[in-house]
């Protein structure tokens, strides 16, 4: 099940809804509130009621450290107590992606990173920094 928790990007909820419909995947949407922890809680309850094996909480992208948005993720984490916390990062961000990953790991205890666009340009080397920094922890 997908849970639409990106309440900031215009049309993010609509985009996730279309994707879920195309793939015949259940999706929890709430266009009536911008309270991300509430939406997450509702989606979590719906997933349990429907016996979902997997729940993905699609949250707003964060290109740099934004304390309010990271705090929002901490609240979401407390609401649903996830088994996995994955950061999806654009390798083109280079060193900034490493800084984001470090902060997210410190605050959320990441269990993994999905790095996109690693073949797009030279900044794809950020993945080596992720690996190196993770090995140091």
Q: Over which residues does each language-model region extend?
A:
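General alpha-helical segment detector with a strong preference for membrane-spanning helices
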Residues: 10, 94, 120-121, 137
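Conserved small/polar residues in nucleotide/adenosyl-binding loops
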Residues: 130-135
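Nucleotide-state-sensitive switch-loop elements of NTP-binding domains
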Residues: 1-84, 98, 109-110, 125
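G-domain G4 guanine-recognition motif of GTPases
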Residues: 3-5, 60, 89-92, 114-121
